[in-house]
Every structure is written in C-alpha cells, then in structure tokens.
Amino acid sequence: MKNNFLQRAITGILFVAIIVGCILYDPLAFGTLFVTVSALTIREFGHLVNQSGEVSINRTITMLGGAYLFLAIMGFCIDAAGSKIFIPYLILIIYLMVSELYLKKKNPVLNWAYSMLSQMYIALPFAMLNVLAFQNDPEASSVSYNPILPLSI
C-alpha cells in the first residue's frame, strides 16, 4: 500500500514537472508536449471504445487527425499559416467518414460518432490551448508566447 502510494506520488510529481517545464520553456516544447499528449489520449480513448465490441474506430487516423488539428491551430495562432492549413484536416475527416461506409463494419454511424467525439472532446480542447498561449499584436504585427495563461488551466 505504502509503496504504491509512493510510486504514484513520484510519477505525479514528475508528470507535473514535465508539463510545467515544457509550458514555461518555449513554444516548441509546449507544442511538442501537447501534440504528443493529444495523440496518446486519443489513442487511449480509441482503445477503450473499441473494447466494447460494438464500436471499431480507426485509432491511427483519429490520432493523426487530433495531432494535425493541434498543429494546424498552433500554426494559425502564430501566423505561420492562413486558414488554408485546415483543408488537410477536413480532407482527413471526410476520408474517415467515407472509409467507414466501405469497410463493411458493424456500426458505421456509431463509429463516425465516436471518431468525431474523440476530435471534439479530446483534440479540440488541447488545440484551444494555443489560443491562450499565443497573443497576436496587430499594431506591431507580431505574435508573442504567454505561458502563464495555459499554465493557469
């Protein structure tokens, strides 16, 4: 009992230290950390959903979609790309929907629903951290990284 508590406490402290360190270090570390966390969280969600037996979502495509959504919103927020950066994400979502129809799976509509849920429930909140982290100053035409706002969440 005591050993398990100690192991969990040390793991928790390390996890918090990595998150805080990456957020405070620089924008690249922030992006790398949260794109990884987003993709792995979607992978775990897909694993849990697929265990039910009724649903079979494509974990690889949903992971790629979640990671790309984070990177696209990050690129848009730092003014590295325009709104056209979201076109590959839309193509990926359309591919996901069309592929479910032709793969002859048990419940294609339920698979769509859980795939979209993973994008909206997991990937989108992580991606919205970029909106908090990067402030655009139109007068100086620059973007600044503010680690305090994502850290406050």
Please give the residue ranges for each predicted region.
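Membrane-embedded alpha-helical bundles of polytopic integral membrane proteins
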Residues: M1-I153
